[in-house]
């Protein structure tokens, strides 16, 4: 690619991959010279009202591993990846003026669906020439038999309409890297400095716990390896429905969620690989149930898009008049010191690894809200701080459910935690693993 072609910015938010990446594909197809950009917004690094930084150490390490992996792949094609932190508009302006001496640069970006992210999108759209893509969704919003504002309130109705009326698109056409050569024009010294700001390797100051259920390594390379292993090498996908409520070990669940949250794995790729597996190996309830869970993820994105800021309000999607509080009980909960063994074991796993099973999440959330009487938003914020697979739509959507202010037709999800422990940890093995 010759040096006279104009620069363009590919601003990746949570699509940290080369496969099924319409932003990069379109940029190169339209014969721009891409600079791939990732920005950690200021709020992710600042202490929130509950005393936590949204981007906690586990999440940050997983993010950095993912960016290092992506940068390595991009460099093989002669493309730079820049990592910045701070105000999004300021950082985009800095890169734009460094590349073109003006702000009139083309930007390709993936859309987000939570309120604050969409607020940023509106500001960016007002300041720059942006082409947006729904790279994080399984479905194309234009194909839905309902508008976003008319998204069904109940998941079963949403799922029914998707399965009946929507055809999932094929993956984005592969990027034609042959159009690219090593970029002849070096980036400015300023931008080269930003390129170096990304660690060359993962942060080793946060040791991994050998009790962890799965050795998560960030990045598209690890994500594709996990997908291939879970489906094709081991065929564990064929028993997913029976094992998904497990607590110990790497293969009781898919472990795809962390890779989906950063976009190291495309939801469309998961869907089409499952369909291919069903055609070539076997189709059963378990293979369908993986798609079922991907549809839950999709549902929460449309719900967040539909309801905006209400997803984060005390009264949630139902706008309930509620009085919420936090006190020393919340501190005991997040430290894993409530005295309830099953709750404490799950919280200790989260604190040590950044991961918790789906069964564990439901129980600890219910216990915080219904047994300890604490503000559900504090629990959601702590999950945001710790979870490798955090995304605002699924996280806050699920907390709305548990707190009884969300889409659940029932009043709330109060779990009998002791009964759950007897059912899912009958021998106490999981609790023992995470006992002090």
What are these regions (language model features)?
Residues 1-170, 348-349, 394, 398:
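Trp/Phe/Arg-rich N-terminal binding region typifying the photolyase-homology
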Residues 82-94, 128-133, 177-192, 405-412:
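Short secondary-structure transition/capping segments
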Residues 149-313, 421-436:
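Glycine/tryptophan-enriched, flexible segments
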Residues 249-436:
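Active-site-proximal binding-pocket segments
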């Amino acid at each position: 690619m010759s040096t006279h072609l104009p620069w363009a910015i590919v601003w990746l938010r949570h699509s940290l991959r080369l496969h099924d990446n319409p932003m990069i594909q379109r940029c190169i197809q339209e014969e721009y010279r891409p600079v791939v950009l990732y920005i950690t917004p200021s709020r992710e690094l600042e202490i929130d009202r509950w005393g936590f930084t949204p981007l906690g150490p586990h999440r940050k390490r997983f993010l950095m591993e993912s960016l290092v992996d992506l940068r390595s792949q991009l460099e093989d094609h002669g493309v730079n990846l820049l990592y910045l932190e701070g105000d999004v508009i300021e950082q985009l302006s800095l890169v734009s003026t460094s590349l073109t001496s003006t702000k009139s640069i083309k930007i390709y970006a993936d859309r987000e669906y939570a309120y604050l992210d969409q607020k940023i999108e509106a500001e960016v759209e007002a300041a720059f020439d942006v082409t947006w893509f729904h790279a994080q969704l399984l479905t194309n919003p234009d194909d839905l038999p309902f508008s976003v504002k008319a998204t069904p309130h109940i998941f079963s109705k949403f799922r029914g309409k998707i399965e009946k009326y929507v055809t999932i698109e094929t993956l984005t056409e592969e990027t034609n890297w042959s159009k690219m050569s090593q970029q002849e024009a070096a980036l400015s010294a300023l931008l080269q400095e930003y390129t170096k700001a990304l660690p060359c390797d993962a942060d080793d100051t946060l040791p991994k716990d050998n009790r962890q259920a799965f050795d998560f390594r960030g990045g598209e390379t690890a994500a594709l390896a996990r997908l291939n292993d879970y489906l094709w090498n081991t065929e564990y996908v064929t028993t997913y429905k029976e094992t998904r409520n497990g607590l110990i070990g790497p293969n009781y669940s898919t472990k795809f969620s962390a890779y989906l949250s950063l976009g190291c794995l495309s939801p469309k790729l998961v869907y089409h690989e499952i369909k291919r597996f069903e055609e070539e190996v076997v189709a059963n309830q378990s293979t369908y149930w993986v798609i079922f869970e991907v549809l839950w993820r999709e549902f929460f994105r449309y719900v967040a898009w539909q309801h905006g800021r209400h997803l984060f309000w005390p009264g949630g999607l139902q706008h309930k008049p509620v009085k919420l509080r936090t006190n020393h009980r919340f501190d005991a909960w997040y430290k894993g010191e409530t005295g309830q063994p099953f709750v404490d074991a799950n919280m200790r796993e989260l604190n040590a690894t950044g991961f918790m099973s789906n069964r564990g999440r439901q129980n600890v959330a219910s216990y915080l809200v219904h047994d300890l009487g604490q503000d559900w938003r504090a629990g959601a914020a702590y999950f945001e701080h710790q979870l490798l697979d955090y995304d605002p739509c699924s996280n806050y959507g699920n907390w709305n459910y548990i707190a009884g202010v969300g889409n659940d037709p029932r009043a709330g999800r109060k779990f009998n935690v002791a009964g759950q422990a007897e059912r899912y940890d009958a021998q106490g093995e999981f609790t023992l693993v995470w006992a002090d």
